[in-house]
Swiss-Prot record:
Listed name of the protein: Lipoprotein-releasing system ATP-binding protein LolD
Quaternary organization: The complex is composed of two ATP-binding proteins (LolD) and two transmembrane proteins (LolC and LolE).
Transmembrane segments: none
Organism: Rhodopseudomonas palustris (strain HaA2)
Stretches assigned to the ABC transporter domain: 11-231
Enzyme class: translocase
Family the UniProt entry places it in: Belongs to the ABC transporter superfamily. Lipoprotein translocase (TC 3.A.1.125) family.
Length: 232
């Protein structure tokens, strides 16, 4: 009997362990961590600096390998995949937003959003249409010809969000996406992210120190002694 796609997490981390060597010491960052991310659900990852938030995001997003455990994407295990296969999943199923927008300075907002689609091999006409649609949806229709230096901090982050969802990913990871923004601008960027979750049913995991924004998300989790714990 086939399992309904709605019953399968978009991403599931199972017994993830990750250690780093520092001199003669071994630091255990993740120690049996488990986490399920579901379609259309926003999850806040709230934990102190150095607790492993970025490591968890990188492993979940297939940017880093765990020492032990398994990452499932759409119900499929990824540990045995080649680097090329992992890269393909990142291009099609996963989007990333960082604290720094990481936009290419020589390209316009439109061109930055077109880039991941062109790398994927889509026709230019398709990439232009899709990029314009997303930028307009995020309130940037009149800024598409501007380069990053000509945009405000909030506009830069919204372009970064548009780029992250350009290939219609199934999951979006954001590492302190509002960390460099003032409270008013941070709220606008957060609303843009939540708007996309509701409209596209993408699963979203945000690492954040902003407890007010975290409180407006569907779930809140933290990291304690290398494991994921649910917060009230």
């Amino acid at each position: 009997m086939e399992q309904d796609a709605e019953d399968i997490p978009v991403v599931y981390l199972h017994d993830i362990k990750r250690q780093y060597t520092q001199g003669e010491a071994t630091l255990t960052i993740l120690d049996g961590a488990k986490l399920a991310l579901w379609a259309g659900q926003s999850v806040a990852l709230v934990a102190p600096s150095g607790s492993g938030k970025s490591t968890l995001l990188h492993i979940a997003g297939l940017l880093e390998h765990p020492d032990e455990g398994e990452v499932y994407v759409g119900g499929a295990a990824t540990s045995a995949l080649t680097d090329a296969e992992r890269t393909q999943i990142r291009r099609t199923d996963i989007g990333f937003v960082y604290q720094s927008h990481r936009l290419l300075p020589e390209f316009t907002a439109l061109e930055n959003v077109m880039m991941p689609q062109m790398i994927r091999g889509l026709k230019r006409s398709e990439t232009v249409s899709r990029a314009k649609e997303i930028l307009a949806y995020l309130g940037l229709a009149d800024r598409i010809t501007h380069r990053p230096a000509e945009l405000s901090g909030g506009e830069q982050q919204r372009v970064a969000i548009a780029r992250a969802v350009a290939n219609a990913p199934r999951v979006l990871f954001a590492d302190e996406p509002t960390g460099n923004l003032d409270p008013h601008t941070a709220d606008h960027v957060f609303q843009a992210l939540m708007q996309l979750v509701r409209a596209t049913r993408v699963a979203m995991l945000i690492a954040t120190h902003n407890m007010e924004l975290a409180g407006r998300m569907d779930r809140r989790v933290s990291l304690e002694n290398g494991v994921v714990v649910e917060l009230e």
